[in-house]
Design a protein with these regions (language model features):
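Basic, helix-initiating cap at the start of DNA-binding domains
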Residues: 1-44, 51-58, 84
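Amphipathic, non-transmembrane alpha-helical scaffold segments
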Residues: 10, 18, 64, 90, ...
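Short helix-capping/turn signature of helix-turn-helix
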Residues: 53, 114-120, 130-131
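Hydrophobic alpha-helical connector segments
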Residues: 62, 76-110, 158-164, 192
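Short, basic, alpha-helical segments at the C-terminal edge of helix-turn-helix-like DNA-binding modules
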Residues: 65-71
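Amphipathic alpha-helical packing segments from all-alpha helical-bundle domains
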Residues: 88, 99-103, 108, 122-148, ...
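Hydrophobic/aromatic-rich alpha-helical bundle segments in the mid-to-C-terminal region
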Residues: 125, 147-196, 207-215, 222
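C-terminal alpha-helix
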Residues: 142, 198-206
């Protein structure tokens, strides 16, 4: 016997509230988003929001934990279980991040934090702990793997981990700023592939550099 419709609807409400909150946070920013508006966007009363979340800050944290953190978990598993070259791993991480975050509404949270973390330092620290620090850690692990295997030069993973994704973060910021002014954006796929070419030219050990074409995985144009 199937569940009553109202029961199924109730089970979906947290997801619907998170989706509405994400839309509004990206559209209006954190400061300008009100719980009344989130409730209206989700088609529920404001009181319903409080049944699931203590307030706007908890709602924001839930958006991050439900939508962004799982992507990091998948990235960590990818790094731990990868059996191919480190060049291919770095490429897979970049393409995977863009597909799961950079090309989705969750990318708007990056622009939001850049704009508003100064006024909301607690949220900034939360985002740094839950997302930024964890992201850099998995990239550092990938880089250290390459160094240990003799595939990468003896670079400093602490600093290079930040350089790896900096161009992608810039692409996201551009998307949520200049794109709205009619300034054209470069094709993301080509942008990522060109970044990989330049990055790996500097990272790969001399003995590996001639084979850097192996960075291209199945389905990627040569």
């Amino acid at each position: 016997m199937s569940e009553p419709r109202w029961t199924r609807r109730k089970a979906q409400r947290p997801t619907e509230l998170l989706a509405a909150a994400l839309e509004l946070f990206v559209e209006r920013g954190y400061a300008a988003t009100r719980l009344d508006d989130v409730a209206k966007r989700a088609g529920v009363s404001k009181g319903t929001v409080y049944l699931y979340f203590a307030g706007k800050e908890e709602l924001f944290k839930a958006v991050v934990r439900e939508g962004v953190v799982p992507v990091l978990k998948r990235g960590e598993k990818m790094v731990s279980g990868h059996t191919g070259t480190t060049a291919a791993l770095i490429g897979d991480l970049m393409r995977g991040w863009w597909a799961a975050i950079g090309s989705t509404p969750y990318a708007g949270l990056i622009k939001l934090m850049v704009s508003e973390c100064r006024n909301f330092p607690e949220l900034g620290r939360f985002y740094s702990d839950e997302v930024i620090t964890r992201g850099y850690q998995l990239v550092r692990k990938a880089l250290q793997r390459g160094i240990d295997r003799g595939e990468l030069r003896a670079i400093d993973p602490e600093y290079v981990s930040r350089l790896v994704f900096a161009p992608l973060v810039l692409a996201v910021i551009w998307r949520y700023s200049f794109d709205y002014c009619g300034v054209s954006q470069l094709d993301p796929s080509r942008y990522i592939e060109q970044h990989l070419e330049v990055l790996l030219s500097g990272l790969l050990a001399p003995s590996v550099a001639p084979s850097r074409a192996r960075v291209r995985t199945a389905g990627t144009r040569a």
